[in-house]
């Protein structure tokens, strides 16, 4: 009986341990996958600074292109596509957090005019849903529905991201007007070089924090290096820690200068930003334009008919 109770207790403990381990794994995976937008969302009230710079550039230091395509004009209460393209060489591999190589992720932030927001699912057409795929967009803040973020997502599949946008209706939103509005976009591919707290990631170059002789290089068991730099004048030693990922450029016995690169720069990604303009068009203005064009066409037709009638009269008089 005691043996059976002990076995039952051991079984419960093993099951509990497995459940806890699984929960920790899931939570860890979730925090890593959603880290990039969270860095900006937690650190900045607005992703676009007064200078026009998007804050993602503070962590992604390399400058890369990004493209945005939107309609020239849209009508009120209409769903349209904002297509963001983040081009890069699909053959490239980036340094992951563990020092290994892997594919690049991409992410984007779309800053829309006030009143514009993510289209509700029931307003999105099947064709647009197919373009969107399995992407899940979120607002930058609960009170900033006009600012949307996405990522990180696999760059191999989503280097082109389609945002479904709903235009506002000035009839129901009095602070919205029929005007031309700017749209801003930022897009990154790959991991950043600096974390929000100012510390470096392993996806950047590491420089010497002192001048002297490289007296010792220790390769760490889990990857990375400990580099001891000895000052030739007073013997003072400084140890620089290199995380797994960057390739070492110096060797023992080498004389180095302050701020000299100790490693290569493994970064193959970067961040870019751009802008576009969109007109919120008044339907009455469109109707007026169509009426004007129709009247011009009718006037041209009547003019041609009148001219032909006049020519017939002239021809009849000449024959008479």
UniProtKB/Swiss-Prot annotation:
Transmembrane stretches, by residue range? 286-305
Residues annotated to bind heme: 36, 56, 59-60
| MF terms in GO | electron transfer activity; heme binding; iron ion binding
The listed locations are: Plastid, Chloroplast thylakoid membrane
Q: Which Gene3D superfamilies does its entry note?
A: 2.40.50.100, Cytochrome f large domain, Single helix bin
Question: How, per the record, is the cofactor bound?
Answer: Binds 1 heme group covalently.
Looking up Pfam families in the UniProt record yields:
Apocytochr_F_C, Apocytochr_F_N
Cellular component (GO) terms are:
chloroplast thylakoid membrane
User: What does the UniProt keyword field contain?
Assistant: Chloroplast, Electron transport, Heme, Iron, Membrane, Metal-binding, Photosynthesis, Plastid, Signal, Thylakoid, Transmembrane, Transmembrane helix, Transport
Specify the domain of life of the species encoding this protein. Answer: Eukaryota
Instruction: Give the way it sits in the membrane.
Output: Single-pass membrane protein
Needed cofactors: heme
GO terms of biological process kind = photosynthesis
Give the signal sequence positions: 1-35
Annotated function: Component of the cytochrome b6-f complex, which mediates electron transfer between photosystem II (PSII) and photosystem I (PSI), cyclic electron flow around PSI, and state transitions.
Quaternary arrangement and interactors, per the entry? Answer: The 4 large subunits of the cytochrome b6-f complex are cytochrome b6, subunit IV (17 kDa polypeptide, petD), cytochrome f and the Rieske protein, while the 4 small subunits are PetG, PetL, PetM and PetN. The complex functions as a dimer.
What family is this?
A: Belongs to the cytochrome f family.
Name of the protein in its database record: Cytochrome f
Q: Which gene encodes it?
A: petA
């Amino acid at each position: 009986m005691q043996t059976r109770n002990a076995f039952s207790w051991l079984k419960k403990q093993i099951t509990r341990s497995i459940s806890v381990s699984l929960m920790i794994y899931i939570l860890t995976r979730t925090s890593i996958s959603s880290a990039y937008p969270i860095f900006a969302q937690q650190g900045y009230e607005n992703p676009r600074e007064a200078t026009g710079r998007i804050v993602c550039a503070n962590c992604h230091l390399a400058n890369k292109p990004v493209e945005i395509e939107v309609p020239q004009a849209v009508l009120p209460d209409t769903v349209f596509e904002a297509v963001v393209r983040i081009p890069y060489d699909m053959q490239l591999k980036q340094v992951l957090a563990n020092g290994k190589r892997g594919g690049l992720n991409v992410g984007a932030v779309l800053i829309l005019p006030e009143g514009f927001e993510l289209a509700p699912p029931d307003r999105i057409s099947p064709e647009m849903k197919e373009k969107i795929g399995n992407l899940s967009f979120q607002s930058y803040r609960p009170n900033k529905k006009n600012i949307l973020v996405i990522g990180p997502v696999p760059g191999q599949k989503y280097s082109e991201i389609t945002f479904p946008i709903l235009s506002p209706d000035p009839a129901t939103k009095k602070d919205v007007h029929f005007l031309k509005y700017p749209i801003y976009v930022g897009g990154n591919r790959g991991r950043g070089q600096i974390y929000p707290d100012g510390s470096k990631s392993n996806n950047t170059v590491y420089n010497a924090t002192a001048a002297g002789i490289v007296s010792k290089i220790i390769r760490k068991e889990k990857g990375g290096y400990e580099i001891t730099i000895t000052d030739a004048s007073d013997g003072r030693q400084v140890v620089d820690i290199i995380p797994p990922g960057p390739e070492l450029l110096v060797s023992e016995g080498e004389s180095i200068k302050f701020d000299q690169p100790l490693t290569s720069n493994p970064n193959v990604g970067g961040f870019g930003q751009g802008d576009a303009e969109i007109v919120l068009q008044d339907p009455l203005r469109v109707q007026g334009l169509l009426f004007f064009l129709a009247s011009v066409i009718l006037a041209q037709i009547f003019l041609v008919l009148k001219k032909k009638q006049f020519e017939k009269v002239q021809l009849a008089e000449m024959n008479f």
